[in-house]
Amino acid sequence: VTIPDPATPQSPPPDDDTGALSERASTASGGSGADTADDGTGSGNAGASTGRGGRRARRTWLGRLAVLAVLAMVAGCVPFLWVLSSTSDHRHTAGAVPERAVALVLGAGVRPDGRPSLLLARRLDAAADLYFAGRVDVVLVTGDNSVEHYNETDTMRAYLVDAGVPGEHVVGDYAGFSTWDSCVRAHEVFGVREATVVTQDFHLPRAVRLCRSAGIDAVGVADSSLEERTFATVYGWFREVPAAVAALGSVVLRPDPTFLGDYESGVDEALALEREPGAAGG
């Protein structure tokens, strides 16, 4: 048996802790890789979450816009239905309309060559028929003459005279810049207290409503001759929805017309004249 010399340094026996440390280091290294892998997965999940969040936000805004669109349609339809219902008893056919002293014809555009637009010509034809049938005695034509080379009123008057209506029974209002302006001026400037409003069927409910709100005992006769023109008719009715909202505002707020002016006696003077023999019935 060899007895080790105490003076000779001895190598330490293998330490199991060294192996454990190596294993822990290896494990830590592996864990770091796993963590790195997890970090990559987390970034991907974050991107996916952001994409889903963006889609949800877009869907939310689209939903809100859809709700607002529906509310706007409802808000527009309520005044439109009010205009229709409040004038249902005051709109008549030409053969059944009550007699009124004055026919009020609303302007509707003039062509560049000076002729009335199709809409306006049909309104004037209907007014002439009422005059010849003895349903009205005077025709008040109201239109836009805000610029020098555009004159709805003179065009309307000339058309009626050419159709056989005596010129002295046609009175012109040159400041009818809107339906509301025309109604207020007919009442305040020309002294009209009752009238038959003549316009297209889609415009008639609003026109009668505004004239009645302006103080005129108004009834209406519609020109329906454009019903075969589907696009024009649909467009006309469609635009009346927002126009009814504006009409409600006029009825509530009662704004002054663009131009009011002094009293004009043209209607009074025309009513004082006797009809020419044979004028009724054309």
Segments and roles (model prediction):
Residues 2-9, 82-238:
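A structural signal for short, hydrophobic/glycine-enriched beta-strand patches
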Residues 255-282:
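Short linear elements at protein peripheries
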Residues 5-56:
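Intrinsically disordered, low-complexity terminal tails and inter-domain linkers enriched
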Residues 47, 54, 58-62, 230, ...:
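Structural motif marking the loop-to-transmembrane transition
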Residues 234-256:
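A transmembrane-helix-recognition feature enriched in membrane-embedded lipid enzymes
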Residues 51-95:
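N-terminal type II signal-anchor transmembrane helix
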